[in-house]
Amino acid sequence: MGASVKPAARRNARQFALQAIYSWQITKDNVATIEEQFLSGDKYDEEELHASEPALAAPETDVAYFRELLSGVVLSHSELDSKIRPYVSRPMQDLDMMELALLRLAMYEMTRREDVPYKVVINEAIELAKVFAAEDSHKFVNGVLDKAAPHVRKK
């Protein structure tokens, strides 16, 4: 991570990427279309936007990281799913869509962004699960990532 990128900007990038990945999973729209909707502020989100929600613009959000996460997860979702599958106790198609988006995002960071410590990846996924997923999803996400980390990261 460059010295100029703040952890909060990365956290915001993950938050927007998670929402965009979730949107892609539901709609299967073109990634560029979804990215543009998020960058323009015209999200699919049916819920009211919170006043405290960060802006998808620098310096508040690492926009380049958002783009990398979104396109990286979408382009490699099948490979990511094959890395996740051994660590989930139920069929992938039975996973909640938000849990799947979280696991794909975290697995992408674990396997493609060795500069991000795996403990940071897991912690960020847990925090996102607490905000965006079902009540106990953070426990499930934590369990899957804890089991997967030693096998996908050689550290």
From Swiss-Prot:
UniProt keyword list: RNA-binding, Transcription, Transcription antitermination, Transcription regulation
Functional description taken from the UniProt entry: Involved in transcription antitermination. Required for transcription of ribosomal RNA (rRNA) genes. Binds specifically to the boxA antiterminator sequence of the ribosomal RNA (rrn) operons.
Record GO cellular component, one term: cytosol
Protein name: Transcription antitermination protein NusB
Organism from which the protein derives: Vibrio campbellii (strain ATCC BAA-1116)
HAMAP family documented for this protein: NusB
GO molecular-function terms, A-Z: RNA binding
PANTHER family on file: ANTITERMINATION NUSB DOMAIN-CONTAINING PROTEIN, N UTILIZATION SUBSTANCE PROTEIN B-RELATED
Family the UniProt entry places it in: Belongs to the NusB family.
InterPro entries to which the protein is assigned, alphabetical: NusB-like_sf (IPR035926), NusB_fam (IPR011605), NusB_RsmB_TIM44 (IPR006027)
